[in-house]
Design a protein with these regions (language model features):
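Basic, helix-initiating cap at the start of DNA-binding domains
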Residues: 1-26, 30-42, 56-59
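Hydrophobic alpha-helical segments that form the core
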Residues: 93, 145-166, 178-189, 202-203
């Protein structure tokens, strides 16, 4: 992206934002490059000059969204008045809001893009490392139980999410319901009494 003019960079960001909005609303397959071009009142050729195919567009959009989320959570967690439960509740609220805006079709179809799946697998490994650091903080602050093997908890939680996605459990119950039940089940299990009292803020 080095050497791009400000206009070209702005256009790239506009295409990315429009595309991800369309993908979230309609699923990936239903959205054509023509649709994105029409929405922005530009030519399809212009879109292809910047993004050579839909997978490239999807991958960059996911990376941008993940980076924005990570930066928000980092800023939130570094504020002096926020403890582990504040951070956990903020994480829950952000994810619940995000899921409310995404069609189940998006999750069905995103699994078909190999480069995207490779990116997500690597991202999940990094998230696991962050999770252990966060849990350690929560234990020290007295919100999470010190007598729990969190490597097992994280592994089981990850498999529960994977099962919900691969079995398409969200089609029957809805994305937010599935997310809420999986997350709250594991959070309740690791919280001390102090943590459980704070957890009432999202229940």
């Amino acid at each position: 992206m080095s050497g791009q003019t400000p206009y070209r960079q702005e256009l790239r960001e506009r295409i990315l934002k429009a595309a991800m909005s369309e993908f979230f609303e309609k699923g990936i397959k239903a959205v054509k490059m023509d649709d994105i071009a029409r929405r922005l009142s530009i030519s399809k050729r212009t879109v292809y000059e910047i993004y050579s195919n839909k997978e490239e567009l999807l991958l960059e959009g996911m990376k941008a969204a993940e980076q924005e989320f990570d930066e928000h959570m980092k800023d939130f967690s570094e504020q002096d008045n926020h403890h582990a439960m504040d951070i956990l509740i903020e994480f829950y609220n952000c994810q619940a809001h995000r899921l409310s805006e995404i069609s189940p079709l998006y999750f069905d179809e995103v699994q078909k893009y190999k480069r995207v799946q490779t990116y997500l697998e690597n991202k999940h490994k990094k998230r696991d490392e962050d999770a252990y650091n966060f849990i350690d903080r929560g234990v020290k602050e007295g919100f999470f139980r010190p007598d729990t093997n969190y490597h097992i908890v994280v592994e089981v939680a990850r498999e529960a999410v994977r099962f919900a996605m691969t079995s398409q459990l969200y089609k029957e119950h809805g994305l937010q319901i599935v997310f809420r039940n999986i997350i709250l089940l594991f959070i309740r299990g690791i919280c001390t009494l102090n943590g459980l009292k704070m957890l009432e803020r999202i229940e």
